[in-house]
Curated annotation (Swiss-Prot):
Keyword check for Hydrolase: no
Subcellular location as annotated: Cytoplasm
Name of the protein described by the UniProt record: Glutamine synthetase root isozyme 3
PROSITE patterns (alphabetical): GLNA_1 (PS00180), GLNA_ATP (PS00181), GS_BETA_GRASP (PS51986), GS_CATALYTIC (PS51987)
Organism lineage: Eukaryota, Viridiplantae, Streptophyta, Embryophyta, Tracheophyta
Length: 356
């Protein structure tokens, strides 16, 4: 007799051409991911071939009850690591029935920036280092920490191994493989400085695809932690005191930066970022003031700085980039709860389009 696991793992491709498409969108808080599934004829690899759908926006904080319908526009397709076969995950953005982007649809403006001729010609590349913290479900206390108490001081946990230093590796590895299966360009993982905190990296990705991939990677992580009975938080400072916060360092380059003489282009771009520091900080995530203190490998939130190999700066340039005279730089200011659509497009807009 079949058990529940057998039925969950049924391979539909043996018996039907129908597929399950899981439509994913961002809810009213700007950080809560929502999803629901529908049956379609398959296989499908082009999002433009997928139908639009709708949902009750009054239940997600995105529409009033008397006019609650919000329309989902499919934008990117990924393979579904949970259902497998020809089943898919579909990243969507959200519109009114009249076709206007709703206020929480940050993808719409980002796509406009990335499709502008100036930005498209520069082919911006991004590598995003997404940090997060795993919490015990019943206590909201970091995984591996004693209930009501604290582990030993930071030091042995970064990239650490062993049962007393590494907590949640099964979740991290499952997420790593699931992202690779889905077609996300996840480039690595590591344990972070605070115990119970981890990081995955997505990229290099070009333009709008960076935001799509980070959001779907977050979705997959939340689904895996759901299965494991663990809570994932993207709070930039989940534990007050002498503990590292969580960021989303954003590595960035343009075609001009990757060519000979690119280091001068990088320095000019950093100068532009300095001039718009306040605007960027305002868009780089909620609660970032608790993280950007000038301690724990961060710069002070009120002061812009940059340096070569300096992890205490707002922007870090790698030693290799300096030596080669071309390459990329790292914006270390974004918080772990930042919206990648906002951050990636804002960096491109400031460094390519904006004229001081």
């Amino acid at each position: 007799m079949a058990c529940l696991t057998d039925l969950v793992n049924l391979n539909l491709s043996d018996t039907t051409e129908k597929i399950i498409a899981e439509y994913i969108w961002i809810g009213g808080s700007g950080m809560d991911l929502r999803s629901k599934a529908r049956t379609l004829s398959g296989p499908v690899t082009d999002p433009s071939k997928l139908p639009k759908w709708n949902y009750d926006g009054s239940s997600t904080g995105q529409a009033p009850g008397e006019d609650s319908e919000v329309i989902l526009y499919p934008q990117a397709i990924f393979k579904d690591p949970f259902r497998r076969g020809n089943n898919i995950l579909v990243m969507c953005d959200c519109y009114t029935p009249a076709g206007e982007p709703i206020p929480t649809n940050k993808r719409y403006n980002a796509a406009k920036i990335f499709s502008s001729p100036e930005v498209a010609a520069e082919e911006p590349w991004y590598g995003i280092e997404q940090e997060y913290t795993l919490l015990q479900k019943d206590t909201n206390w970091p995984l591996g920490w004693p209930i009501g108490g604290f582990p030993g001081p930071q030091g042995p946990y970064y990239c650490g191994i062993g049962a007393e230093k590494s907590f949640g590796r099964d979740i991290v590895d499952a997420h790593y493989k699931a992202c690779l299966y889905a077609g996300i360009n996840i480039s690595g993982i590591n344990g972070e400085v605070m115990p119970g905190q981890w990081e995955f990296q997505v990229g290099p990705s070009v333009g709008i695809s960076s935001g799509d991939q980070v959001w779907v990677a977050r979705y997959i992580l939340e689904r895996i932690t759901e299965i494991a009975g663990v809570v994932v938080t993207f709070d930039p400072k989940p534990i007050p005191g002498d503990w590292n916060g969580a960021g989303a360092h954003t590595n960035y380059s343009t075609e001009s930066m990757r060519k000979e003489g690119g280091y001068e282009v990088i320095k000019a771009a950093i100068e532009k970022l300095k001039l718009r520091h306040r605007e960027h900080i305002a868009a780089y995530g909620e609660g970032n003031d608790g993280r950007l203190t000038g301690r724990h490998e961060t710069a002070d939130i009120n002061t812009f700085s940059w340096g070569v190999a300096n992890r205490g700066a707002s922007v870090r340039v790698g030693r290799e980039t300096e030596q080669n005279g071309k390459g990329y730089f790292e914006d270390r200011r974004p918080a772990s709860n930042m919206d990648p659509y906002v951050v990636t497009s804002m960096i491109a807009e400031t460094t390519i389009i904006w004229k001081p």
